[in-house]
Amino acid sequence: MIIKNNTKIAIIGLGYVGLPLAVEFGKIFETVGFDINISRISELEKGYDSTLEVDIMELQESKKLLYTTNTSDIQSCNIFIITVPTPIDEQKKPVLTPLVQASEMVGKLLKKDDIVIY
């Protein structure tokens, strides 16, 4: 994969996998961190990570990172990295609902030559 000047990355899900990834990409590339949890986005915009995956200094170093709950903010992205939770149920089977919902959402936004990574 060749990274071009117009690369814009969307990280879908800002948990223990997605947030550190978004922070690192946001130091170099235009990056949008998307999550459905409004309070999660609010705390990150204020420079705080309640999961303690990323410290305040790292959050501040990601100058090209935008946090959002709005799908219109990720429409212009051309790389989508889906990092939503896959919890298990009582029978220890994966609950794929978050993954399916994220995939459907991204599927509605895809354009020719876009890349989706799971």
What do these predicted regions represent?
Residues M1-Y118:
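Structural/interface elements that position substrates and couple domains in central-metabolism enzymes
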